[in-house]
Amino acid sequence: MSHIQRETSCSRPRLNSNMDADLYGYKWARDNVGQSGATIDRLYGKPDAPELFLKHGKGSVANDVTDEMVRLNWMTEFMPLPTIKHFIRTPDDAWLLTTAIPGKTAFQVLEEYPDSGENIVDALAVFLRRLHSIPVCNCPFNSDRVFRLVQAQSRMNNGLVDASDFDDERNGWPVEQVWKEMHKLLPFSPDSVVTHGDFSLDNLIFDEGKLIGCIDVGRVGIADRYQDLAILWNCLGEFSPSLQKRLFQKYGIDNPDMNKLQFTLMLDEFF
């Protein structure tokens, strides 16, 4: 993502709601990095006021924003997360206003301080182990392989999968080929934990060298631990294969299951 402008200035929307009072006096910037389908605006520059984020989803994306609100409420007991300021839901739209976690994303830190890569990966591994240690019996959300495959097939059948955004390994593949090759990797035994669902470098926040929280938790749920490991491993590949190897070492896996890893990355292409 380093080759694109991560934010562009934008104007404040008119919501005509009790949320409006919290929006006045801020400067606005539109996020260009997220791929959730929602619009994400950063609110900043208001004297003596914290930075905020406003996420808006329409249609099916409104359900995704609602899912994130519900998971934020549940996850706050276990992990450092943004705080919900307001949530509005109508039949077609959802708006979620949260506090910002101060700092920079792991991606930004790795770009600015490439020599800190090993320390960053070590912190990510510790944080991920903490997340995966949440008792599965406490989690009310299912994000397992079967659930995600049903969602993926629906998106494929409705033409919602963007083949132009596939990883380099699958560049030029039709969606149906990814679906076919993915199923060749089945079956395998699940190793279920509470997962983030999109444990990417852009969703992990560092401040003063410490990993202090995560964002974008709309896919939190019980799934195989490789749901998180594979996505983070893939992100680290933009920087160095040595960081990818270190991730598994520090997480505590001596022999990564490449079958699970590749399955997860193929499945993620559908979202």
Swiss-Prot record:
Disulphide-bridged cysteine pairs: none
The EC number(s) this enzyme carries: 2.7.1.95
InterPro entries: AGP_Transferase, Aminoglycoside_PTrfase, Kan/Strep_kinase, Kinase-like_dom_sf
Pfam families with a match to the protein in the record: APH
Catalytic reactions on record: kanamycin A + ATP = kanamycin 3'-phosphate + ADP + H(+)
GO MF annotation, one: ATP binding
Keywords: Antibiotic resistance, ATP-binding, Kinase, Nucleotide-binding, Plasmid, Transferase, Transposable element
UniProt similarity note: Belongs to the aminoglycoside phosphotransferase family.
NCBIfam families: APH_3p (NF033068), APH_3p_I (NF033059)
Name by which UniProt lists this protein: Aminoglycoside 3'-phosphotransferase
Species this chain originates from: Salmonella typhimurium
Taxonomic lineage: Bacteria, Pseudomonadati, Pseudomonadota, Gammaproteobacteria, Enterobacterales
